[in-house]
Amino acid sequence: MILMSGPCVIESYEALSAVAQALKPLSEKAHIDFYFKASFDKANRTSLESYRGPGLEKGLELLSEIKKQFGYKIITDIHESYQAKHIAKVADVIQIPAFLCRQTDLIVEVAKTERIVNIKKGQFMNPSDMQHSVLKAIKTRGGTQATYEQSQKYGIWLTERGSTFGYGNLVVDMRSLVIMRSFAPVIFDATHSVQMPGAAGGKSGGDSSFVPYLARAAAAVGVDGFFMETHLNPKEALSDGPNMVQTNALIPLIEQLYDIENLTQHKNGK
């Protein structure tokens, strides 16, 4: 099972390392392929006044320290094409945000690196249309078609994070997992799927109480891994606190997901 977890944004090295330390029990499990996640910049915050992060240079420096201290593989976001070569020096996975999932130049630049490319499905996207984004990356790396096998070979992943459902709300169509998994490995982002974009007066809201339910459903349907942002105290988080999982609640949830995944895969023979 792939697991990407960590705080939404880098707040400080102390906060970053505290979460990294709390996640060690998960990272040490043989059945979990763990990636530590944190963003150096939240470039699409609702308000200009909202905290964005330390920026590219300082953020990568802090993530590099986490990598050295804990031995973690790193995943972080990219926002502009020029950042790819810099991020690739630190990150093992470069993530293309949902709002940028169709940006050809960005996808191509990330695909030119030797890092895994994780493309988040836009909240506005038909899941079947994500094969075009996948194919941009695959062809950049010398492949020819968007199939699960070629996506896996060339290191191209997709992440489901919910679809727009009216104003300020998202819903998860579990069929999306099946559709996208026909042409790429799929990660389920359980924390952003419970986000309520822009619904909290100048910032996004959310309801993390729904995270376990959606995650268990995704495990039963079948995915390649999970993305879950976490914080020691989500109420004090500087970004996405309402939809993050408290770190001490994450470990038992992940074990439960692993059990469900094993059960359903055995029954389905996959």
From Swiss-Prot:
One of its GO terms (biological process) is keto-3-deoxy-D-manno-octulosonic acid biosynthetic process. It holds the Pfam family DAHP_synth_1. Its EC number is 2.5.1.55. One of its GO terms (cellular component) is cytoplasm. Keywords: Cytoplasm, Lipopolysaccharide biosynthesis, Transferase. It is found in: Cytoplasm. It catalyses: D-arabinose 5-phosphate + phosphoenolpyruvate + H2O = 3-deoxy-alpha-D-manno-2-octulosonate-8-phosphate + phosphate. Pathway: Carbohydrate biosynthesis; 3-deoxy-D-manno-octulosonate biosynthesis; 3-deoxy-D-manno-octulosonate from D-ribulose 5-phosphate: step 2/3; Bacterial outer membrane biogenesis; lipopolysaccharide biosynthesis. The keyword Transferase applies. PANTHER family: PHOSPHO-2-DEHYDRO-3-DEOXYHEPTONATE ALDOLASE. This is 2-dehydro-3-deoxyphosphooctonate aldolase. It comes from Helicobacter hepaticus (strain ATCC 51449 / 3B1). The lineage of its organism: Bacteria, Pseudomonadati, Campylobacterota, Epsilonproteobacteria, Campylobacterales. The gene is kdsA.
